[in-house]
């Protein structure tokens, strides 16, 4: 299995023995050094021998790659400024091309809680929905993020996060996790009505 991460959040990946390669793309070399020094728990995965760090722009790194990755994890910052390119339809299309036939992309989706963030939230879903045959949004409580209520996106060429979910297969692996459970997996995709309405409106207008 080959994984690509934009950002430095790799701490959970090494527990999966089937992962062969992890490419981490982070243009800011100093940021990586600071994370490893002051946030060792968050950055501990960077020391895994399967991890390869590339200090360059994620869009430029992926452009031209075809069918190389099983999963792409986009842990970018907010959709403006120097990272704005990682929230464009072009970028999501490039991710689609870089994934294998059954590839998955997960990414931070912001929050619809505040009115000023709603337009970015809708725009992101619209672009991914147009780029992937399967596109779902899930939620988590992240106290360090604005409002504490944060959304993430799941996009795939083949697998649906609920219809293809096999809880028995997960339990049989006996992996020790700090946060994830099969019940949490199912619950994360159960969204509040106002969020469902926002997503459905974008899908109807762009279906």
Sequence positions of predicted segments:
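The AdoMet/dcAdoMet-binding core of the Class I SAM-like
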Residues: 12-102, 115-121
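Short "lid" loop at the C-terminus of a central beta-strand within the Rossmann-like core
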Residues: 78-79, 110-114, 142-144
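Conserved Class I S-adenosyl-L-methionine
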Residues: 92-93, 118-139, 153
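Conserved beta-strand signature within the Rossmann-like core of class I S-adenosyl-L-methionine
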Residues: 102-109
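Short acidic/glycine-enriched loop/turn segments that link adjacent beta-strands
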Residues: 146-148
């Amino acid at each position: 299995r080959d994984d690509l991460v934009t950002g430095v959040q790799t701490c959970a990946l090494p527990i999966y023995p089937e992962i062969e390669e992890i490419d981490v793309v982070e243009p800011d070399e100093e940021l990586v050094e600071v994370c490893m020094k002051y946030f060792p728990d968050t950055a501990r995965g960077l020391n895994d021998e399967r991890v390869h760090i590339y200090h360059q722009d994620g869009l430029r790194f992926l452009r031209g790659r075809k069918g190389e990755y099983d999963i792409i994890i986009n842990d970018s910052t907010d959709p403006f400024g120097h990272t704005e390119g990682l929230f464009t339809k072009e970028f999501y299309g490039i991710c689609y091309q870089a994934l294998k036939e059954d590839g998955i992309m997960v990414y931070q989706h912001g929050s619809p809680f505040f009115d000023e963030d709603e337009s970015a939230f809708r725009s992101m879903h619209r672009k991914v929905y147009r780029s992937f045959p399967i596109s779902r949004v899930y939620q988590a409580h992240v106290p360090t993020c604005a409002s504490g209520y944060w959304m993430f996106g799941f996009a795939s060429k083949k697998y649906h996060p609920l219809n293809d979910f096999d809880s028995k297969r997960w339990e049989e692996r006996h992996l020790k996790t700090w946060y994830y459970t099969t019940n949490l997996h199912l619950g994360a995709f159960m969204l509040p009505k106002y969020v469902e309405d926002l997503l459905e409106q974008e899908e109807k207008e762009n279906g």
